[in-house]
Regions:
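A ligand-binding cleft/hinge motif common to bilobed small-molecule-binding domains
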Residues: 92-95, 221, 226-245
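Short beta-strand->loop
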Residues: 103-111, 126-127, 155, 244-256, ...
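Mature extracytoplasmic/periplasmic domains
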Residues: 265-324
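Conserved C-terminal helix/tail region of periplasmic/extracytoplasmic solute-binding proteins
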Residues: 320-349
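Early extracytoplasmic/lumenal segment of secretory-pathway proteins
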Residues: 25-92
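Periplasmic-binding protein-like
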Residues: 133, 197-203, 242-266, 301-302
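A bilobed periplasmic-binding-protein/Venus flytrap-type ligand-binding module shared by bacterial periplasmic
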Residues: 137-143, 181-183, 258-271, 289-292
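Extracytoplasmic ligand-binding site segments that recognize negatively charged/polar headgroups
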Residues: 33-43, 67, 82-83, 87-224
Length: 349
């Protein structure tokens, strides 16, 4: 064999081994999280920058519409998990924690845990908060000319049949019950939400739908309904997309925080690459990027958010945010749901 041929074969062999080594080293992280707008914005703001900074790690996004379905997937895959990281509501994260489906996220998993706001670390939950959102009142500014000031404006006669609220078991309906319960003098929502249920009973005759589809924002933008309730983050993005037709306000009675947690799946296939993604997702850089992209309030206290973005979150209105222990509330959620079925739904028919 000629020397040149030997050299060519040697180079080819070395190249092949190098390629095999690169393939062997590449890791995949599967992130299970919300579909739709969340997926679109989170991919651009967090996942793509993470992959750029970590060229040896590929992130695959597995979208699902809600946290309950995510928990169902985790349960079904317990023996052989397919996901490494899950972003879901805190109450569902608690259920996954109790079922030992998760690894606790502490400073050993991510150094950024130390910089999270105190309410981002939830007792007896393995995940930590990755976003804060809050309930807002929505309205179609082409029809409703004056910005509403109270949640009870939804009960005004001129809105008969024009209100859309994602009702219970959706957490948005439950949140509105809690807000109005406090506004009307209810002391402990874990003992009674009678005042909140009564308030929703007054709004109910105006409600066109408790199940706006595909979600509440386009229903109000289209004029099918003209007022309602929804989450601030999606409301802000839809307000921009509608050219300002959809508007969102924080009524005088206040709001509550909804907490999305990021969770580390036990025995996930991506191993330590999952922890690396979680660390990045909790970093000031990622928190800033997603807040400025979709207007979720950040959970990392060191995130330097622009004034324009912060103004579109509840961060500057914390005095209006009612504290809720979602974990304790989960224990009384079914009795509240039963009151909703008996005392609210019939009044909207």
């Amino acid at each position: 064999m000629q020397a040149s041929t030997k050299l060519t074969l040697a180079i080819a062999l070395a190249a092949g081994l190098t390629a095999q080594g690169a393939l062997a080293q590449e890791q995949t992280v599967t992130v299970m999280a919300y579909s739709g707008l969340f997926q679109e914005r989170y991919t651009k703001a967090v996942i793509e920058p993470f992959m750029k900074a970590n060229p040896g790690i590929k992130v695959e996004y597995f979208p699902l519409p809600n946290s309950a379905q995510m928990l169902g997937n985790l349960r079904a895959q317990k023996a052989a998990p397919q996901a490494d990281v899950v972003i879901m509501d805190v109450s569902v994260s608690k259920a996954a924690t109790d079922e030992k489906l998760l690894i606790k996220i502490d400073d050993k998993v991510s150094k950024n845990v130390a910089d999270l706001y105190p309410n981002a670390r939830i007792a007896d939950v393995d995940g930590v908060a990755v976003t804060f959102d809050n309930l807002v009142m929505l309205y179609n500014s082409d029809v409703v000319k004056e910005a509403p000031k109270s949640w009870m404006d939804l009960a005004k006669p001129d809105l008969k049949g024009k209100v859309a609220i994602p009702g219970m078991p959706d957490i948005q309906g439950l949140s509105l019950v809690l807000i109005m319960n406090k506004a009307r003098g209810g002391a402990d929502y874990l003992k009674s939400v009678d005042q909140g249920i009564a308030a929703l009973g007054e709004i109910a005759p105006n409600v066109q739908t408790w199940e706006p589809k595909p979600e509440v924002y386009p229903v109000i933008i289209s004029g099918q309904a003209v007022a309602g309730a929804g989450w601030n983050a999606r409301a802000q993005v839809n307000a921009d997309a509608s050219g300002g037709k959809l508007k969102a306000v924080l009524p005088q009675e206040g709001s509550v925080f909804q907490i999305n947690t990021i969770n580390y799946v036990a025995n996930g296939p991506g191993k330590d690459a999952g922890a690396k993604f979680i660390d990045y997702a909790l970093s000031p850089e990622a928190q800033k990027s997603f807040t400025e992209s979709m207007f979720y309030a950040p959970t990392n206290a060191k995130a330097q958010i622009s004034d324009a973005a912060i103004a579109r979150t509840a961060v500057k209105s914390m005095d209006k945010v009612i504290p809720v222990d979602w974990i304790a509330l989960a224990k009384v959620r079914e009795p509240i749901m039963e009151q909703w079925r008996r005392k609210v739904i019939p009044l909207s028919r």
